[in-house]
Amino acid sequence: VSYIRHAKKPYIFVGGGAVISEASEELKEFVELVDAPVTDTLMGKGAYDGTGERYTGMLGMHGTKTSNLGVSECDLLIAIGVRFSDRVIGNAKKFARHAKILQFDVDPAEVNKNIVVDACVMGDVREILKKVNERLEPMEHREWMEHILEYKKQYPLTYHPQGLSGPYMI
């Protein structure tokens, strides 16, 4: 909890462990308490509301520019039920290089496997979040969130169709 309380630019990174653990409600409360942006992996889809303003899209090679820039600038990455796959981290030496990394996970094989973390809390993600939420007071990271929201405006995930796509032409 100390890492979380001292962070000025926290970022929450959600993976499949949060889905398997059915931790959506606890995750929602955690995000509100920490007042931080949220990114996820393909396996983490559904654990957090992908339509909310705090949500920045997926992370990594299949992710958004906002998520990738934000994680590169954060001072604390809170990894919840993630594997740190190569499609997410890219160059391990450059991944979240300005951040402490705090991992919540049930699988000891995932800890320090691809990314060395600063601290890990082992156990069921839902239970971890319940306990952490009980110990946190609401925080405010207004400037950090405004910075991330500016990225979302500057680099929106949009689609602009121009003419017929390949399948329609056939």
Enumerate the language-model features and the residues they cover.
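Generic signal for short, ordered secondary-structure residues
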Residues: K9-P10, D49-G50, G90, D107-V111
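Glycine-rich, anion-gripping cofactor-binding loops and their flanking helix/strand elements
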Residues: A18-L102
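Glycine-rich, N-terminal phosphate-binding loop of Rossmann-like dinucleotide-binding domains
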Residues: V14, I80-G81, D124
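Phosphate/pyrophosphate-binding active-site segments
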Residues: V1, H98-I170
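Alpha-helix C-terminal capping/helix-to-coil transition sites in glycosyltransferase folds
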Residues: H6, S72-E73, V116
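Cofactor-pocket helix-loop regions in the catalytic cores of large enzyme subunits
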Residues: V1-E53, E143-I170
